[in-house]
């Protein structure tokens, strides 16, 4: 995707915020527990390479990604010796590519290990489906057979075993406890404990630090975002959001009563009012459902009017502004703030989706 460096729309990523979130989490972990930075989906929209560098500087001991291509991008960017785990499914024909690049893969089916052609040792992490219902083995028999396969094949190393909690971001813990118990049953069925046992995502690491095992997978909260609104007041430390989204007014004009804007003419002025056109739209991740939400101009709220277009959006101004005036879509402006949580609430989604939607057409600028 082409990045729009010649357009006045940009994302600022505060590296100091990422470092602070990591340090605060590390301070509550036992020294024996590693923190792995989850940088999948372009680091949740924050930029995979720069976030990985920042996380490593802050003390992260490795990285988790969703697909092999993300792991290879890290290797190509200079992370040659760092631990990298692919959490999602990888094609069998790509196993050798992962092995040659010392990338750990998730295994969740016995048949995946059959007839692999490897030129180097492949490190695998056994995924246990303890109740999430996506990927993973579900019985002790499966776990023992996969362990036996890896033991008998000198080119396979059962490096880790893990699970993922479905309700760690909820205050009610009964289902979480059921999952943990099932995982522990499968873990104890193995003859040898793998090097890495890991279960905790951001929510679990924040609320259930006792189940850190050997490593935690620190994702959404590394970026300063709360795993869910339900647990926001129960966090052990304040999270610092790292992402802000800005643009500038490229056209300012006054509407007369009866004038309409954007596709479908869904918004019509009832009085004289000032509006501005912003060079950002749903092709950038500012989806059409943002219509009716608001931005900040000079610290004041300005509603998004009419339909969000592919490349442009129109806002109603509280008064006349100069062309080129800065607009805050996510972030702080003169003491007021619009957060990813605010946008998520309006869009009826979660903060993860808000930032992940912001694609690479918007340039990232890294500060601090």
Curated annotation (Swiss-Prot):
Keywords for this protein: Isomerase, Pyridoxal phosphate
The cross-references to CDD domains, in alphabetical order and at most eight, read: PLPDE_III_AR
As cofactor, the record names:
pyridoxal 5'-phosphate
* Pathway named in the protein's UniProt entry: Amino-acid biosynthesis; D-alanine biosynthesis; D-alanine from L-alanine: step 1/1
Record GO terms (molecular function): alanine racemase activity; pyridoxal phosphate binding
Q: What residues does substrate bind to?
A: 134, 310
Q: Report the GO terms under cellular component.
A: cytosol
Q: What InterPro entries does the record point to?
A: Ala_racemase, Ala_racemase/Decarboxylase_C, Ala_racemase_C, Ala_racemase_N, Ala_racemase_pyridoxalP-BS, PLP-binding_barrel
Group of enzyme by EC: isomerase
- Name the residues annotated as catalytic in the UniProt entry: 40 (proton acceptor), 263 (proton acceptor)
Keyword check for Isomerase, yes or no: yes
**Swiss-Prot/TrEMBL catalytic activity:** L-alanine = D-alanine
The entry's function note states: Catalyzes the interconversion of L-alanine and D-alanine. May also act on other amino acids.
Q: Which family does it belong to?
A: Belongs to the alanine racemase family.
Q: What is this protein called?
A: Alanine racemase
- Corresponding gene? alr
């Amino acid at each position: 995707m082409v990045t729009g460096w010649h357009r006045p729309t940009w994302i600022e990523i505060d590296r100091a915020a990422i470092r602070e979130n990591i340090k605060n989490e590390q301070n509550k972990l036992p020294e024996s527990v590693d923190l792995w930075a989850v940088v999948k989906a372009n680091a949740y929209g924050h930029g995979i390479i720069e976030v990985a560098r920042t996380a490593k500087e802050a003390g992260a001991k490795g990285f988790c990604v969703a697909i092999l291509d993300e792991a290879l991008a890290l290797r190509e960017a200079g992370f040659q010796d760092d631990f990298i785990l692919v959490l999602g499914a990888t094609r069998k024909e790509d196993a050798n590519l992962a092995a040659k690049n010392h990338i750990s893969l998730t295994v969740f089916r016995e048949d995946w290990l059959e007839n692999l052609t490897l030129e180097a040792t492949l490190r695998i992490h056994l995924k246990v489906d303890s109740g999430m219902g996506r990927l993973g083995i579900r019985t002790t028999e499966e776990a023992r057979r996969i362990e036996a396969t890896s033991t008998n094949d000198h080119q396979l190393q059962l490096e880790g075993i893990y699970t993922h909690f479905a309700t760690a971001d909820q205050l009610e813990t009964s289902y979480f406890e059921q999952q943990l118990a099932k995982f522990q049953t499968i873990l104890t069925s193995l003859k040898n404990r793998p090097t890495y046992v890991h279960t905790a995502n951001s929510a679990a690491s924040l609320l259930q630090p006792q189940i850190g095992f050997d490593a935690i997978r620190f994702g959404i909260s590394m970026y300063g975002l709360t795993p869910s609104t339900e647990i926001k007041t129960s966090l052990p430390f304040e999270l610092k959001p790292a992402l802000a989204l800005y643009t500038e007014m490229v056209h300012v004009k006054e509407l007369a009563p009866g004038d309409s804007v954007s596709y479908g003419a869904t918004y019509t002025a009832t009085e004289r009012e000032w509006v501005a056109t912003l060079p950002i739209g749903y092709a950038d991740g500012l989806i059409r459902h943002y219509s009716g939400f608001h931005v900040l101009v000079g610290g004041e709220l300005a509603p998004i009017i009419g339909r969000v277009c592919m490349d442009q959006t129109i806002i109603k101004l509280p008064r006349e502004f100069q062309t080129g005036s800065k607009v805050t879509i996510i972030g702080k402006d003169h003491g007021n703030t619009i957060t990813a949580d605010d946008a998520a609430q309006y869009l009826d989604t979660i903060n993860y989706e808000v930032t992940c939607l912001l694609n690479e057409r918007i340039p990232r600028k890294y500060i601090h």
